[in-house]
């Protein structure tokens, strides 16, 4: 296809096309996820939600994007200008980089590396640097306090999340995401959610805490510290933080589907319904499972009040981490005993 180009471009262009094919849909999904969030929470609270721009409000995300693009990026006089502008980039770059190893189907992945799970844990943890930098560079006590809260929270829940994913690693016998999904073949009852149920719950709740979403959004608690680490941000600089948060939400949901719910595998494998749904592409099953987890994100926001900071820390260190360690021992024993059908 690119034979007429220099050899260096023949390698680079296909990779760039694949990156665009992942990043562009992600940005579009984020745009309409914000619309879905406002509508769903509106219905839960007996309201209509946005309904003015376009038919039934479906063009509201476009209006929001135009508004953010036209707004001025105001830099406080006492802020560190370079670091202030660098922080949003440092927040969104890791959130996008992680998607390089996410498989959407058996052979639909940008980089099929064997240490994909390790890569996700390493790169995913780097987004906290953007948050810390934003809090420090803003030269605001509210921003700095929000950044410190966020850093402590992310580090705390990353341990529990990492231990939960180690359980999947033991069960699947691989760090490759595709191989972990293939290890769950056999239908709904063969997926890892059943033997790893406590780790499944802890992973998802830790994911909600890591993305600073309600009820764990003390890092940007409006009633306590105005708006947290991005209190001084406006325009597209603010939009990048916003984009990073929602991309991480989608990432946590997609990983939950891959690690615990069989990824792109049909839930009807091994049943009489398997032949009926055989025509459904694997990526559709993955999108449905991801959408279910995203709905839980929105449901939590509409349902639960914000936890106190000390309650969040206690939950992470004194409840989640001990449970994950105990269950890892249980999973290790089940693996040694080759308990079927998950650990054979």
Swiss-Prot record:
GO cellular component: plasma membrane
Signal peptide positions on this chain: none
Organism domain of life: Bacteria
Presence of keyword Transmembrane helix: yes
Subcellular location: Cell inner membrane
Bilayer topology: Multi-pass membrane protein
GO biological process terms on file: aerobic respiration
Main localisation: membrane
Keyword annotations: Cell inner membrane, Cell membrane, Membrane, NAD, Quinone, Translocase, Transmembrane, Transmembrane helix, Ubiquinone
Transmembrane portions of the chain: 13-33, 82-102, 116-136, 161-181, 188-208, 240-260, 280-300, 319-339
EC number, UniProt record: 7.1.1.-
GO molecular-function term, one example from the UniProt record: oxidoreductase activity, acting on NAD(P)H, quinone or similar compound as acceptor
Top EC category: translocase
Pfam families associated with the record: NADHdh
Catalysed reaction equations from the record: a quinone + NADH + 5 H(+)(in) = a quinol + NAD(+) + 4 H(+)(out)
Keyword Cell inner membrane in annotation: yes
Self-association and partners: NDH-1 is composed of 14 different subunits. Subunits NuoA, H, J, K, L, M, N constitute the membrane sector of the complex.
Function according to Swiss-Prot or TrEMBL: NDH-1 shuttles electrons from NADH, via FMN and iron-sulfur (Fe-S) centers, to quinones in the respiratory chain. The immediate electron acceptor for the enzyme in this species is believed to be ubiquinone. Couples the redox reaction to proton translocation (for every two electrons transferred, four hydrogen ions are translocated across the cytoplasmic membrane), and thus conserves the redox energy in a proton gradient. This subunit may bind ubiquinone.
Family: Belongs to the complex I subunit 1 family.
Protein name (record): NADH-quinone oxidoreductase subunit H 2
Organism: Nitrosococcus oceani (strain ATCC 19707 / BCRC 17464 / JCM 30415 / NCIMB 11848 / C-107)
Record gene name: nuoH2
């Amino acid at each position: 296809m690119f034979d007429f180009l220099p050899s260096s471009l023949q390698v680079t262009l296909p990779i760039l096309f694949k990156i665009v094919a992942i990043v562009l849909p992600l940005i579009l999904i984020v745009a309409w996820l914000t619309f879905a969030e406002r509508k769903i929470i509106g219905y839960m609270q007996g309201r209509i939600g946005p309904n003015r721009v376009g038919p039934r409000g479906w063009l509201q995300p476009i209006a929001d994007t135009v508004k953010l693009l036209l707004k001025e990026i105001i830099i406080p006089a006492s802020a560190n200008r370079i670091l202030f502008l660098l922080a949003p980039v440092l927040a969104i770059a890791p959130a996008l980089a992680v998607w390089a190893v996410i498989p959407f189907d058996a052979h639909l992945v940008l980089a099929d590396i064997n240490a994909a799970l390790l890569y996700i844990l390493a790169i995913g943890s780097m987004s906290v640097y953007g948050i810390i930098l934003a809090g420090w560079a803003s030269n605001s006590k509210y921003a700095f306090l929000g950044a410190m809260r966020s850093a402590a929270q992310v580090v705390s829940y990353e341990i529990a999340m990492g231990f939960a994913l180690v359980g999947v690693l033991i069960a699947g016998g691989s760090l490759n995401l595709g191989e972990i999904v293939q290890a769950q073949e056999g239908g709904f009852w063969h997926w890892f959610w059943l033997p790893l149920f406590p780790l499944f719950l802890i992973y998802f709740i830790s994911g909600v805490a890591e993305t600073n979403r309600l009820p764990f959004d003390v890092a940007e608690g409006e009633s306590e510290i105005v708006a947290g680490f991005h209190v001084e941000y406006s325009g597209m600089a603010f939009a990048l933080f916003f984009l990073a948060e929602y991309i991480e939400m989608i990432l946590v949901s997609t990983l939950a589907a891959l690690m615990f719910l069989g990824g792109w595998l049909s839930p009807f494998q091994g049943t009489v319904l398997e032949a009926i749904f055989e025509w459904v592409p694997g990526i559709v099953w993955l999108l449905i499972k991801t959408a279910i987890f995203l709905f839980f994100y929105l449901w939590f926001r509409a349902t639960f009040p914000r936890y106190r900071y000390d309650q969040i820390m206690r939950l992470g260190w004194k409840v989640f981490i001990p449970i994950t360690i105990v269950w890892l021992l249980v999973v290790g024993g089940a693996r040694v005993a080759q308990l079927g059908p998950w650990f054979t």
